[in-house]
Amino acid sequence: MRRIFFILTTLIIVSCNTNKPTQTAATIDGNRITATFNDTTKLFFILTDNNELQLIWDNSENKRYNSQQRLHYHGELNIPSTVMLDNKSYRVTSIGDYALYQQRELEKVIIPDGVTYIGEKAFSGCDHIIEINIPQSVTSLGEEALSRCKRISEIKLPNELVTIGAYCFRNCVSLHTLSMGEKLETVPQGALFGCASLTEVHFPKQLKSIGGEAFSNCLSLRSITLPSQIDSLSNALFASCESLEDVTLPANLETLPADIFNHCSSLKKINLPTTLKKIDEWAFEGCTSLSTIDFNDGLEIIAEGAFAGCASLKQITLPASIKSVGSLAFGVSGKIKEVTILGNKAFEIGVRSALPQKPAKIYVPRGSIDQFQFKPLWKEYFLVERK
């Protein structure tokens, strides 16, 4: 006969036992199971089609999170590896979406080996968690699975991990070290957005891509070496990393995407790959310490605002390969005093201050000034032939 249970809709505080959980009761309603451990700790599970268990946030069928209709845990929570029901053992293999969302009194969570999936926002907003283990069996982390866990300082991802959801560790502000598993091929969008204490990242050798904003607002990140096999990057990847000083870019990049180093105010110099063809919009905007930039021969496009607000730049040289420079590419600060153009033909420029304006001097090859001064938009600049 099916056992029926009811959920109290008032707030219940559960003190979690720090020892290995001993099951003392279990009831089932349809495919939803309530199990009690050490006589005090209640956990809720759903029985999947594979006869395995997924930890869920409550035992109702209401899929919307409701903080008043759930148990609240504090201290240490030891998630069991199995649950006994009617003399049959069921394995716990996943932690569902929102399972422990905003459990603000939890300090430590022990996840059993055998769990393969941790769902969307499963631990998001667990402000007081200091320690959480991610077992080697885990192959997938959902979107924002551990976002806003503000006290976790170090995470070692398992070698079997294949997938990380977007913004997985967003605003884990105490996280200073992250080691990624060797099978991980993609760091998704916003994965470490706002991890203000992050100083060190270890990438797997076979990493293929990194999503936009993945390290944006990592205020303590000083140095980063991107894996050489990556051939494209995403927008705002390191935006507002105000301590970033040293960057090693992959050798085969053709484009630096929009906002990639936007407001990296400590960046003084960067070596661009020889394969680079385009620097996109606002890529280095607000890099106030950037004092030198060597453009590679082969660079074709410097887009709008790419170096706007780079107040320490005093001189630039544009290679003969340049085909287009967008509006406000070097801003309007007046700090750049001279520009040297190596090509002998005018290239396309934006309608608004694509190059530094007078009194800055724009040096062009000897005998080529007519190729520039009679072209549209070039008349406003102080053109000088090199000797």
Task: Please report, for each region that a protein language model flagged, where it lies by residue.
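N-terminal low-complexity, Pro/Thr/Ser-rich intrinsically disordered segments
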Residues: 21-44
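Consensus positions within tandem repeat domains that build extended binding/scaffold surfaces
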Residues: 96-99, 119-122, 142-145, 165-168, ...
